[in-house]
Amino acid sequence: MLKCGMTGGQVKVFGKAVQTLSRVSDELWLDPSEKGLALRSVNSCHSTYGYVLFSSMFFQHYQWSPFATMSDTDLPLNLNCKLAIKSVLPIFRCLNYLERSVEKCTVVARADKCRVVIQFFGKHGIKRTHNVYFQDSQPLKIIFEKSLCANILMIKPRLLTEAIALLTSNQEEVTFSVTPGNFCLKSLSGELLDLTSSVYSEMSFGPEEFDFFQVGLDTEITFCFKELKGILTFSEVMHAPLAIYFDFPGKPVVLSVEDMLLEANFILATLVDYPSRTSSPQLLPLSQARRSHPIQSSAPEDKSRVSQTPESISRAAPKRLFPKDSPDSSSAAETKRASAGQDDIFEVPESVVSDMEEERSPSHLRKFSCMFFGAVSCEQQEYAGHPLDSLAVASDSEEDVSG
C-alpha cells in the first residue's frame, strides 16, 4: 500500500517529473519503497531509461507497506503499478494553476484495488478525484556506475538551454564533443549531411563555464535530443545543476539532477562509431595523471580573462569513415578489425553494439547501440546474458508538454 501527501509547490515538481518521463515512453511505473517513491520509464527498444526518486522527506507524509492482502484469499500482493502515461499526463498538465490553487494532494494505491487514486484539495472546499487503473507489472531496474565514467561535467541548465535554442525545432540528435580544454555542442555529428540542405549549428564552452569539468578521454558522442530538452526543463524547475557522465561512443550517457529531496537520472544510448571503437583501446587505459584537472568553480564574471588550457590528449580515433572506393583505406580498415578482434578486452555490458560491421553500406556503419541493462527485475534476470540488438529511435511519445 502507498499513501503520500503533497502541497501545491510539491505538486508542481512531481508533475514536471511526470512530464519529463512522458518524453521517454508511453508507460510509467510507480515504484514505492522505504526510501521513497520512484517514477520509472523505459522506451520500447530499451535505448532510453529514466527514473526520478522522490525521497520520503519530499512529501508532507509518506506511508508505505511492502505487501497487501486480498480479503478473500489473504495472499500477499506486491505493489507493482504500471500506468498509461496518457492517463496520468492530463492530471498534471496545468502545473502553474495547480501550484496556485491546490492546497493539498494525496496519492493512494493498493495492490488489491488495481488503481491509483489522486485527489486534489483546493480552496473553498473544492475536491477533485482521479482514479487511474494500473497493470500489475514489475518495473525494470538497472545498475549503472556513473561515477566511473571518464568524463564528468556539471553545468547550470540555463546555459545549456540557451545553447540548444540555436538548434532547429525538428532536430532529432545532438552531439557533444569534449577535450580537456573545450566543450562543443553540435547539431550534427562528425559525418556531416548535405550542408546545402541542412542547417549546421555549433557552440563551444570553456571549462570556466562549468561548475565541474573533468575530461579523461577526448571523445564525441551523439544521442537523442528530445530527452535532453526534457531533463533541462526539469533541472530548471529544481534550480539544480545538470551533471553529464559519459565515456566513448557506444556507451550510454547519463544526464543527472540531484537534490537533497530527489534524484533524477536519464540513461541514453549513443551512436556507435565503428572505426573509433576499434581504436578505442588505445585511449581507454588513461592514468589519473593524464586526466584534465577537475574544475569546481562557478563561471567568473569577467569573461575576457583567458583561462589556461590543460594539455590535450591526442585523439586516436578517426572522425570519418574511410572512403569506400579507396583500396588503401579498405585494407587499413580490415587490418584494424583483425587487430581489434585479437585483443578486444573492453566489452561494455551496459550497451550492446549491433553486429553490422560486415555490412559495406555506409548507412549501416553508424547506429545507435541498444542499452542492455545488466541488472533487471527478478523476472528478467534469466535473459541478462543474452544481449538485445536494437536501434534507438525517437521516444514513443512525441508530444511536447508545456509546464
UniProtKB/Swiss-Prot annotation:
Pfam short name (any one): Rad9
InterPro entries from the UniProt entry: DNA_clamp_sf, Rad9, Rad9/Ddc1
Gene Ontology CC terms: checkpoint clamp complex; nucleus
Name by which UniProt lists this protein: Cell cycle checkpoint control protein RAD9B
Family label: Belongs to the rad9 family.
Record-level GO BP terms: DNA damage checkpoint signaling; DNA repair
Region annotated Disordered, chain positions: 285-347
Disulfide-bonded cysteines: none
UniProt organism field: Mus musculus (Mouse)
Subunit structure: Interacts with HUS1, HUS1B, RAD1, RAD9A and RAD17.
Modified residues (Phosphoserine): 354, 363
Keywords: Phosphoprotein
